[in-house]
């Protein structure tokens, strides 16, 4: 019994997460290559390993031979083939493992900086965190443990490339699954998410259980759950929006804390005209337009923010223009407004 071979196979299988059968096959192939190198390509050579005892048998033209007589050059050939085959098996194992984890969060330690990108030690391999997938303003030091989303896994020839992300919207989604059990258990559903990494995220949630407050559960007792997520993101602001099937209600919720006076929906153009008082205008639009931009992405509507004066002027201009057309009366104009056509621009865009 070849206990030493069995021990080596067992050790490689554990360390590299490779099936033992694959390793036995690799050794048989390496011995076959060595035998062909020693005896010549024309010879009929067969190599087998007993999986229970570890005993090796090499046959040449049906005759049992001693593989230890192959010589140094043949042994070197066997070594090279074995190393190559085990590397291929390990690459396949890593590819399979991380392909299954694509879209999930993984924890690793920063190994080194490669220009503006980071190499992250994931145990059996390294992940690549490019600058474009980092949160703006964040810095990390070597040895620091960080959490990332497994964004992409691909075989690039001699190694597996694992692209990581901390700026992708799904990173937020997975963090909520980790921090909020009701999200993990699918009692609370993340219906939509819009993110500008490092600055602000809006996440719309709903609950299938009327006894569970979706917003309160995500915030946690005294804000404990949302604080953990914000801390992980380096202070990025997160607005938790209560989902509603009504577009008007959802848009209103997404623009909070701004107070909405009126919303007009134009379904043909996918445009929502939101009216707010002058005092609420900057709050609704947000810094550099961020609040309304994220609300638009969250709800799927192109949102225009107007003051009551601007809204009234648009309606007045529309009415004056329509009055010049023969046969147009108040009822027709009211129908246009009900369809979300509230100014001349809307009228032109719908092709009137």
Which positions does each model-derived feature cover?
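RNA-contacting regions in translation and RNA-metabolism proteins
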Residues: 1-352
């Amino acid at each position: 019994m070849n206990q030493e071979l069995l021990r080596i196979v067992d050790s490689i299988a554990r360390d590299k997460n490779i099936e033992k059968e694959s390793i036995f096959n690799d050794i048989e192939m390496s011995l076959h290559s060595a035998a062909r190198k020693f005896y010549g390509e024309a010879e009929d050579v067969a190599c087998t390993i007993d999986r229970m005892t570890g005993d090796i048998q090499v046959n040449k033209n049906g005759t049992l031979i001693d593989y230890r007589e192959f010589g140094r050059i043949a042994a070197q050939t066997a070594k090279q083939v074995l190393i190559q085959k085990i590397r291929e098996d390990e690459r396949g194992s890593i590819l399979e493992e991380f392909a299954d984890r694509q879209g999930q969060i993984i924890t690793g330690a920063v190994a080194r900086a490669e220009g503006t990108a980071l190499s992250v030690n994931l145990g059996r391999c390294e992940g690549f965190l490019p600058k474009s997938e980092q949160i703006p303003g964040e810095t990390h030091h070597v040895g620091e443990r960080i959490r990332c989303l497994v964004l992409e896994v691909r075989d690039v020839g001699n190694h597996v490339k694992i692209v990581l992300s901390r700026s992708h919207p799904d990173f937020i989604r997975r963090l909520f699954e980790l921090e909020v059990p009701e999200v993990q258990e699918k009692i609370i559903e993340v219906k939509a998410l819009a993110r500008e990494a490092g600055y602000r995220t809006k996440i719309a949630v709903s609950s299938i259980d009327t006894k569970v407050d979706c917003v309160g559960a995500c915030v946690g007792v005294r804000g404990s759950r949302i604080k953990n997520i914000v801390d992980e993101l380096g202070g990025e602001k997160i607005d938790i929006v209560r989902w509603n099937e009504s577009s008007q209600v959802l848009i209103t919720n997404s623009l909070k804390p701004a107070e909405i006076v009126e919303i007009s929906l134009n379904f043909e153009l996918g445009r929502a005209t939101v009216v707010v008082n002058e005092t609420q205008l900057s709050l609704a639009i947000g810094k550099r337009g961020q609040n309304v931009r994220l609300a638009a992405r969250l709800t799927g509507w192109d949102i225009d923010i107007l003051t009551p004066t601007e809204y009234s002027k648009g309606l007045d201009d529309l009415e004056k223009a329509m009055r010049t057309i023969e046969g147009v009366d108040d009822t027709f104009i009211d129908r246009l407004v009900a369809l979300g056509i509230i100014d001349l621009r809307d009228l032109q865009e719908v092709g009137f």
